[in-house]
Structures are given as C-alpha cells and as structure tokens.
C-alpha cells in the first residue's frame, strides 16, 4: 500500500510540472517557433503589439495542451481504478493464504487421528543428545506392566525413566562411544537387574541397577558399573545383544558388524566365539536359534559349532531386520533389501531346524527401518513414518501376510504433545539430520518410540486383540485327525472289552456256561501258572459265598420249586438255611471253616445235580 501511494504522488507531481511547463511563455514561444517557423518581415514592429499570426499560434498550442490534459486525465483515471482494485485483490489473497495457513496449522494435530485413537499417550521425554538405543527393563508392577525403560544416547550415557516420564537415573557408562545395543535381565535378587550395553567402538559393559526396596523410596534407583567384558577391543560396532538362560547360569550373546558371534559368561569372560557365513539379526529366546541375512542358524554351546541353512522362498534377497512374534515363537517378520515385508517360520531345534518364507509383500518404505511386535500387531518405523500391521488372525498370516491398518507420520505424532512452533523446528532440524528409527516394547501393550531430535514417547496400546474362535479351527490340521484317531481307537477297544466280558465266568445266571468253563479250567489247570490258578480260586471263593436273601423262606422255596416244576431233575431241593443264616453261621463261614491251604482242591458244585446236567447235555 505504501508503494502504491508513493507512485500516485510522483505521478501527480510529474503531471503538474508538465502543465506548468506548457503554460510558461518561454516554452510556448519555443514551441510555436519550432512548430511554425514564420520569418518576421517587419523587423521594425514594436514588441508590445501582438499580431494575428502570433494569436493563431497560441490558440493551436492551447488546443494541443487541452488534448494532452484530457488524455492525461483519462490515463490518471484508469491508473486510479487499477490501483484501487489491486490492494483489494492483494488483501483478499493474503487473507486467503492466512486462512489456509491457519487451517493447515490446525490440521496438523488432526491430520491422522488413527494413532491417538489406538495408542494412549503416557509420557514424553526430551534428551539433550541423540537417542541411539531403547530397552524396556524387566521390572514389573503389581499389574504386571513394565515400570522402567532405559535410553542410550550418542555420548555413552544411559537414562532410566519411569513409565510416567520421570527421570530415575542419569548414568555415564565410562565409555563415550554411542550405545548401539542394549539388553537387560533380572538378578537373583528381586529388586536388582543387570544392564548390558554394546557400543559403537566394540566395547561391551555390564551395569547393575538397584531400585528402592521396602522402607525406601520406591521411585529411587541406583546404577553402578560392574565392569567390561573381555575381548571387546576389536573396534567393530556391536549390533546385537541377547541373554540365554541354562538353569541358573546365564550367557550373553554378542554380535558385531562383521557377523562374529561371541558368547560371554556372567563373570565377563569369553566362553567362545564363532563366525557364521551370514550376520545374525535376531535370536529365538531359549532355543539358540537365530535368523541371519540369508537364512537361519543354530549354536551348540557345548561344542561351539554353528549349523546354517538358507530360508526357503527368500530368493537370494538380503534381510535387513527381523522380529519374532509376541504370541507365537516360531513366527517372525522381516524387511528385505528389495523393500518387502516377509513372514517367516522357524521350526525345529538346534540339531534339526527349518526356515521357510510363508508370505511376501512389496511396500513403499525407505531404509533404515526398525521392527517391533506386540500382541497381535507389528510396528515398523522408518525415518518419517510408523506403520501398524495386524498379524493376530491366522487367515492373514496364512494367505497374504501382515495386513496394513494405518500409517502415521512422526511429525503428526509429535504434534500431539508439542506446540506447532516446536514441532516445526523439530521437523526442520530433522531434514538436516537423519533420524535413527527406534522402537521398543514389553511384548504386551507398552510401546516406547523415538521421535527424533531427542524426543522419546511412551504409549499404551488400545488395539483389540482378536482371539481365534471355534469356527476358525483348521479342520484339516493333522493334530485334529490324530485326536479323532485316538478317540476312535479308545471307543473301539472299550466296546470290544465290554463284548468279551459281557458273558464271562462272573455271570451267575448261566449255569451251563459256568459249568463248562469250570470243567475246562480243571482240565487245563496244569498249563497255567500259579498266579493264574490263584486268581481263579479267588474268583471261585467269591462265588462260593451265598449272600442272604431278602425274602422269607417259604416264598423263596415256593418260587424256586415253581421254576423247577417243569424239570424235576434240574434242581435239588434248596434248604432255607442257604438263604437265611444266623450270625454264628455267618461267622463260621467267614472264619476258619474255609479251606485256605493253597487252594489246591477243586471246589464242589454249588448244586448237587450239576453233574447230571452235564451228563445229560
């Protein structure tokens, strides 16, 4: 607006000067003389007398000046109109740009609501240096959630934070080299843990972290350096640290940039070292199996020998990073040099194992990346975004691999707890400096993620964990058919046993079968062992005892004789004492009256005429 006003004033000043110049007599004379050069014939004429020719010349000059003034007036009017319209348009454009800028600044916090809806923000911390490594410590609270997490930076320091973001410990590890790997495990004491840090210079250090016990401040902790591991002065960067438990003995496995695998004991001495053909990327806990850039391998601690094999379906591409599933140990997810997300199965033991790629998916993602798994989900972080994948249902895993739920920009995640100005400064700083992707978890719901420029944030997952329903059971599974086979075999043999024992010798209602089986047993008794004969005698002894009847003697006798009336020779008269006995007789029959001397003699038939029945038959 100031430039337009200055232009208008300069133009009017030029216009007024031009009019005054034309109206001046000297300029008019010069103009007239140049336009109509008429010689003075009468040189003697007096200068005060004005001739007709001079008046004509003045009239022509005035007419030209009027035309010039008219043209200039029209030009000024046009310029005024244009100048009056231009500020409105400029102001309108500026207002529109400001509105768009305000809308854009407002939409930064609402650009991707997926992250804030699915992950609950817990805390955020700011380091004055670059974070290079994150590890969730094994301390648990009464709810089973992790209490602390440790962050290593580029100057060799370790920061221990509470889950709510409070700084618990700031500790210098005695090595100013950046921390590139970190692992922790519990001590034999409940309130102590050990933290192992691997540095870019190849140094591996052991530290002890002790939290406040009962009677002390529970939110206080002390960290001290225990010592340095032997044989770590080769200068190669430590890329991987893992702890292996054998009973109460712990071994620390370390891998450097060249792929060399070194095993240390708890007292920081070297147990052994071996160099595989491909660099290990991740270890399967408690099985000494690991995935490499080209396949898989296993380590035998006794002989310190390595077995390696290629991964079926990898097709000679190199894996950059791996992470094992949080629920199923045999599953792993990786990112290859071809920009593919792969789903891998690692089965077997250290002597016989097999690696197979189940699925591949091409993605638009730039390296480097960091992978982390929580229950049912996979998270991949690069320098700009975080990608969340669903791996909870078996259908996705068996057919197309992990399914992408949503991506979220790190800038949008930062804007949820930073102001717009601070977030913009962080973004500009990240454009100049490359961000190291960092992410860690407790394999449950707690997530710790580096957001660049020293910011580290913690989140709690609100994602639903889908459990396999009954109708999703794989009916073609071999385990299911094996269970069916076992059930069928059990049913068949149980029915067969019932059919064989249904009419056995214990049945008192088949006298003919009982008599024939007794005769057969007597004839073939010499062919059986002593134990078999004793078992038969015990069975005969049980059958020899007749239980008292609940019916009166008369009714029992009449009922029995009515049956035997059809065949008088089939049964002998039954005495009533066989059905009703006194207490003394019961005592006599259950006492010494029985022949217990070896059970050598064959017992007599219960009824007297059984032999006659056998003869008649």
Curated annotation (Swiss-Prot):
GO terms for cellular component: endoplasmic reticulum; membrane; mitochondrion. The chain crosses the membrane at residues 10-30, 473-493. Residues 590-599 have a biased composition (Gly residues). The keyword Transmembrane applies. It comes from the Eukaryota. It is a multi-pass membrane protein. The keyword Membrane applies. Residues 60-86 form a coiled coil. SUPFAM superfamilies: WD40 repeat-like. Residues 34-58, 511-617 are annotated as: Disordered. Residues 511-529 have a biased composition (Low complexity). Residues 531-543 have a biased composition (Basic and acidic residues). This is Uncharacterized membrane protein At1g75140. The lineage of its organism: Eukaryota, Viridiplantae, Streptophyta, Embryophyta, Tracheophyta.
């Amino acid at each position: 607006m100031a430039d337009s006003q200055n232009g208008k004033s300069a133009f009017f000043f030029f216009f007024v000067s031009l009019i005054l110049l034309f109206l001046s007599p000297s300029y008019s004379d010069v103009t007239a003389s140049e336009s109509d050069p008429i010689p003075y014939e009468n040189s003697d004429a007096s200068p005060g007398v004005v001739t007709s020719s001079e008046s004509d010349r003045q009239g022509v000059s005035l007419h030209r000046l009027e035309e010039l003034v008219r043209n200039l007036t029209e030009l000024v009017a046009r310029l005024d109109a244009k100048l009056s319209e231009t500020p409105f348009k400029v102001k309108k454009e500026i207002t529109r740009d400001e509105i768009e800028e305000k809308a854009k600044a407002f939409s930064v916090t609402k650009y991707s609501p997926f992250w804030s809806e699915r992950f609950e923000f817990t805390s955020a911390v700011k380091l004055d240096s670059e974070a290079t490594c994150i590890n969730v410590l094994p301390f648990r609270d009464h709810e089973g959630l992790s209490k602390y997490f440790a962050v290593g930076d580029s100057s060799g320091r370790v920061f221990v934070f509470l889950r709510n973001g409070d700084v618990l410990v700031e500790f210098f590890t005695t090595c100013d080299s950046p921390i590139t790997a970190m692992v922790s495990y519990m001590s034999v004491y409940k309130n102590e843990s050990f933290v192992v840090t691997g540095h870019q210079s190849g140094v591996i250090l052991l530290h002890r972290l002790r939290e406040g016990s009962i009677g002390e401040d529970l939110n206080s902790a002390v960290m001290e350096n225990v010592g340095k591991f032997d044989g770590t002065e080769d200068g190669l960067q430590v890329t991987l640290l893992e702890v292996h438990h054998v009973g109460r003995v712990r071994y620390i496995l370390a891998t450097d940039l060249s792929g060399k695998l070194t095993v240390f004991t708890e007292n920081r001495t070297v147990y052994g070292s071996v160099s595989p053909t491909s660099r290990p990327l991740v270890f399967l806990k408690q099985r000494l199996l690991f995935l490499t850039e080209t396949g898989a391998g296993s380590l035998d601690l006794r002989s310190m020998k390595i077995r390696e094999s290629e991964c079926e379906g990898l097709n000679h591409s190199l894996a950059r990073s791996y992470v094992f599933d949080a629920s199923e140990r045999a599953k792993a997810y990786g990112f290859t040099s071809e920009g593919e997300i792969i789903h891998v199965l690692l089965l077997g033991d250290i002597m016989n194992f097999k690696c197979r790629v189940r699925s591949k998916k091409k993605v638009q993602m730039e390296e480097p990346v960091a992978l982390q798994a929580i229950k049912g989900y996979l998270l991949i972080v690069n320098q700009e975004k975080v990608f969340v994948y669903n791996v909870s249902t078996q259908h996705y895993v068996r057919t197309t691999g992990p399914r992408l739920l949503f991506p979220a920009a790190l800038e949008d995640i930062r804007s949820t707890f930073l102001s717009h100005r601070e977030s913009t400064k962080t973004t500009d700083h990240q454009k100049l400096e490359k961000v190291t992707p960092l992410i860690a978890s407790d394999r449950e719901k707690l997530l710790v993620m580096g957001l660049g420029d020293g910011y580290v944030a913690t989140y709690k997952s609100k994602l639903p964990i889908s459990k396999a329903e009954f109708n999703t059971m794989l009916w073609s599974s071999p385990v299911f058919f094996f269970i069916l086979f076992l059930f069928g075999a059990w049913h068949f043999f149980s029915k067969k046993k019932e059919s064989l024992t249904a009419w056995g010798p214990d049945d008192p209602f088949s006298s003919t079968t009982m008599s024939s089986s007794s005769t057969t047993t007597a004839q073939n008794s010499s062919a059986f062992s002593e134990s078999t004969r004793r078992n038969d005698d015990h069975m005969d002894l049980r059958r020899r005892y007749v239980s008292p009847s609940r019916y009166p003697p008369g009714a029992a006798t009449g009922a029995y004789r009515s049956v035997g009336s059809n065949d008088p020779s089939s049964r002998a008269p039954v005495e009533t004492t066989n059905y009703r006995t006194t207490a003394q007789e019961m005592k006599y029959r259950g006492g010494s009256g029985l022949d217990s001397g070896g059970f050598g003699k064959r017992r007599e038939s219960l009824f007297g005429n059984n032999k006659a029945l056998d003869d008649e038959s």
